[in-house]
UniProtKB/Swiss-Prot annotation:
Entry similarity comment: Belongs to the glycosyltransferase 1 family. Bacterial/plant glycogen synthase subfamily.
Residue ranges of the TM segments: none
Pathway named in the protein's UniProt entry: Glycan biosynthesis; glycogen biosynthesis
Gene3D superfamilies: Glycogen Phosphorylase B (3.40.50.2000)
Example of a GO biological process term: glycogen biosynthetic process
Binding site for ADP-alpha-D-glucose: K16
Name this protein carries in UniProt: Glycogen synthase
Keyword Membrane: no
Organism field: Oceanobacillus iheyensis (strain DSM 14371 / CIP 107618 / JCM 11309 / KCTC 3954 / HTE831)
Enzyme Commission (EC) number: 2.4.1.21
Name of encoding gene: glgA
Function according to Swiss-Prot or TrEMBL: Synthesizes alpha-1,4-glucan chains using ADP-glucose.
NCBIfam families referenced in this protein's UniProt entry, alphabetically: glgA
Keywords: Glycogen biosynthesis, Glycosyltransferase, Transferase
Catalysed reactions, as listed in the record: [(1->4)-alpha-D-glucosyl](n) + ADP-alpha-D-glucose = [(1->4)-alpha-D-glucosyl](n+1) + ADP + H(+)
Amino acid sequence: MKNILFVTSECTPFIKTGGLADVSGSLPQALQEHGGMEVRVMLPLYDEIDRSWKDQFEFVCAFTVSLGWREQTAELYRYRYNDVTYYFIGNDYYFTRKGIYGYYDDGERFVFFSQAIIASLEYIDFIPSVLHAHDWQTGIAVALAKIYQPIEELITVFTIHNIYYQGTMPLTTFDDFFQLGREHLAGMEWNQMINSLKSGIFHADKITTVSPTYAEEILTPYYGAGLEEMLWNRREDLIGVLNGIDLKDYNPAIDKSLPVNYRSARSKKIENRKLLYEEIGLNLKDGVPLYIMVTRLVEQKGIHLVQRILEEFLQEDIQLIVLGNGEQEFEYYFKDIEYRYPDKMITHLHFNESLARRLYASADFLLMPSKFEPCGLSQLIALQYKTVPIVRETGGLKDTIIAFNEITGEGNGFRFANYNAHELLHVLKYSLEIYQQPSLWSVLIKNVNKSKFSWKDSASAYADVYQQLDASSVSYK
């Protein structure tokens, strides 16, 4: 039996800002169901966690965490949910705030969390054989685990969810936050800054990321965000494991957010669309396909490409709904287009999970023209709700969506290769052509219905990673 301790900055169902929370919430349970492992999870006790959860947490103890020359108190709480044990690290100064990211001292906050992770190993009723850390917020914990060796022969795995977020801090924080010799600086420093993500990459026994294609991409300058050379040097220890989704949660047959549940019947999608349009004020047009974007409105998501071609595509007989928020420039743009095309487009700038699910259940197509996408969640959800993804060939989008071939009848969506607006427009018009041919559309939808990406496959791949990293295969120097 292997004992795995996940350390993460967010985790469903307690706190979520993005896909990291879904991984941290779903993968541990899938790993336990795979067998041969007990997986526990540790995360900060944020003020933002709902009181209905916090009232159930069991206080374990308080302990002292050294942050350079300072000493801070950490409180340890424990909770068991769906057969998984969760630990929460509390500190009023660092975690009693509105939201969980975006503060000037985020680096310090998650150095504290990383120090607390290592210190807490003395107080939890669990001796991990593997410490599995996620993203820059816990990269320092991987470094400290290797330096301090709090548990004999503790193996470390570090997962990169998005390499563009690296948790950098001024070089002076090395002396301010750590009681370490200067010989350890090289493993944390990058470009005259302390780099939390680099710290995890440098010290981990195994490095994973969230899709096979993304693992290849981050070895190149275009995607590597400055760390490609270091990753190239460790490429033998880098593996891409595709994320999954919870197929019980994202199930249109039982989803309580939907006014009309369904398995595969196309007519049920139209019923959902009719009710959705009544709610948001868009006129239903028979035979007109609905395209949706459920996304953050930021450059990474390919919004610049959409800006260049949207008005031309809106000349076609289609409708579009955009759900998401982000950069003001993009928010203003979509609201302006909505104003000028009121019968064809609606923009909803406040993300709402229930509305997102109703969009998936009503739409024909999901558009994801991402500049880069480590794995992607929306395209996997779309497939579950019988909605056809249109994606750029990058990261997990390339690994999960196969371009439809009208000759062979293979494929579960549409793809374009280059980050180019003309290619995007071409594939959008091609998707409309296929939609307008019922025999081809029927073949495509059958393929979509067969596409399943559960956590079961991800758990099996991670179990193999843990198994490979036995005590004889890693260095503890």
